[in-house]
From Swiss-Prot:
<keyword id="KW-0547">Nucleotide-binding</keyword>
<feature type="site" description="Required for activity">
    <location>
        <position position="373"/>
    </location>
</feature>
<dbReference type="GO" id="GO:0005524">
    <property type="term" value="F:ATP binding"/>
</dbReference>
<comment type="subunit">
    <text>F-type ATPases have 2 components, CF(1) - the catalytic core - and CF(0) - the membrane proton channel. CF(1) has five subunits: alpha(3), beta(3), gamma(1), delta(1), epsilon(1). CF(0) has three main subunits: a(1), b(2) and c(9-12). The alpha and beta chains form an alternating ring which encloses part of the gamma chain. CF(1) is attached to CF(0) by a central stalk formed by the gamma and epsilon chains, while a peripheral stalk is formed by the delta and b chains.</text>
</comment>
<keyword id="KW-0066">ATP synthesis</keyword>
<dbReference type="InterPro" id="IPR023366">
    <property type="entry name" value="ATP_synth_asu-like_sf"/>
</dbReference>
<dbReference type="GO" id="GO:0043531">
    <property type="term" value="F:ADP binding"/>
</dbReference>
<keyword id="KW-0067">ATP-binding</keyword>
<dbReference type="InterPro" id="IPR004100">
    <property type="entry name" value="ATPase_F1/V1/A1_a/bsu_N"/>
</dbReference>
<protein>
    <recommendedName>
        <fullName>ATP synthase subunit alpha</fullName>
        <ecNumber>7.1.2.2</ecNumber>
    </recommendedName>
</protein>
<feature type="binding site">
    <location>
        <begin position="169"/>
        <end position="176"/>
    </location>
    <ligand>
        <name>ATP</name>
    </ligand>
</feature>
<keyword id="KW-1003">Cell membrane</keyword>
<keyword id="KW-0406">Ion transport</keyword>
<dbReference type="InterPro" id="IPR033732">
    <property type="entry name" value="ATP_synth_F1_a_nt-bd_dom"/>
</dbReference>
<dbReference type="InterPro" id="IPR027417">
    <property type="entry name" value="P-loop_NTPase"/>
</dbReference>
<dbReference type="Pfam" id="PF00306">
    <property type="entry name" value="ATP-synt_ab_C"/>
</dbReference>
<comment type="similarity">
    <text>Belongs to the ATPase alpha/beta chains family.</text>
</comment>
Amino acid sequence: MQLNASEISNLIKDRIKGFDGAAESGSEGTVVSIADGIALIHGVSDVMYGEMVQFDEATFGMALNLERDSVGVVVLGEYEHISEGDKVTCTGRILEVPVGPELNGRVVDGLGRPIDGKGSIDAKVTSPIERIAPGVIERQSVDQPMMTGIKSIDSMIPVGRGQRELIIGDRQTGKTAIAIDAIISQKNTGVKCIYVAMGQKASTVNNVARKLEEYGAMDNTVIVAANASDPAALQYLAAYAGCAMGEYYRDRGEDALIIYDDLTKQAQAYRQISLLLRRPPGREAFPGDVFYLHSRLLERAARVNAEYVEKFTNGEVKGKTGSLTALPIIETQAGDVSAFVPTNVISITDGQIFLETGLFSQGIRPAVNAGLSVSRVGGSAQTKAIKKLGGGIRLDLAQYRELAAFAQFASDLDPATKAQLERGKRVTELMKQKQYSPLTIAEMAVSLYAANEGYLDDVEVEKVLDFEAALHAYLNSNNADLAAKINAKGDWNDEIISEVKAMIDAFKANGVY
């Protein structure tokens, strides 16, 4: 029997008309391949981008690549027990982490699970790790100070509540030290703190937790730790989990501070995941969306207005603004701030604190380069006292740097230049500060006033810090009322100035330093 072409065509058409195979849409699939923490799954056509999928009772993954025939899933945890052919189920949920005051004083992993051996956390609220940042209308300008207790930062590079201030520098320049001091400085202010450690050694994170406990700051702090030994997925997600914990306070009219230590390692973890998912690499092998990786994270740090808080809390909290202040940390290679990730984060943030290896080696710690560091919005948030006194300090340091370079080639200098150089040496010495010893507003104001008014000019450079320590002790013991007055409002009026002047004159007359 022979069929001609038209009969074959009619047969095919009849078959097509009678076909009743509805396309299967499944919420259950099969593992096609598993390697390096990335599972390729077939059959889960219903899955959303970023959805949690379940391998077994204890193992979850996150869908990051949605392709025509398969889904690329990053496994959140150990993956050695997963094998080809295993069943995978969609959960229909986006990744959420526990948030709220129950986490204070605890160390958790990148998914909010406790890792400090202090038992489970019974958080009443969970929050998705990815949220859209508040819009322009919902924000309020930054006009309240976030005091770090570090003279060089609060006087020259001030940080406000709701600001994003980058801490950038080479390894071993004191970046984490500044962040930890900022947390310690908040212990009596009611500001809640979140310290996110990504790609750090477990011993380093343990040391941070110990220091915060020692200085009484752990009670209002939660540490989110995705250590170097943890999967890249947890190192990538930890920052978003920490941000969700901070947003809990921001949206309820409270103030929170979050430290990302550090975003360089987070970007490297994301690069690793992207390359394993076979996404096309770009500059320095980073994927094309690495800018968005950090911008969507840092834009969530903001000061929100009272209307936003009232709407979010359904009218429970009225007339209060909330803020989330971010201090992201970036590690540079040999001082190269023009690399891909540093330039991205510099452009996203509201200023940067630039730390220099050279200054650190000279013993100037914190090693802040006042010339390259800037705060774009913090000036309007400074306390009155520090704002009035800080300008003179910055000017003295700038003139000192200029003259010091010139003085290397000049044989004899006029008296005015010599006096400026001597003043600059003492101000540089005064800007040094020991770790774990943040200052109060009053202590800082008195130190800056002493420098501006020339009280340090007859003090030997080596004794400047001894002079300052003795002056603070004298202020807190003999003039506690004056210190309390300055700390309460941060005012700097004629009455306070005359009291401070009389106090320093009396102190210098004693000469006990």
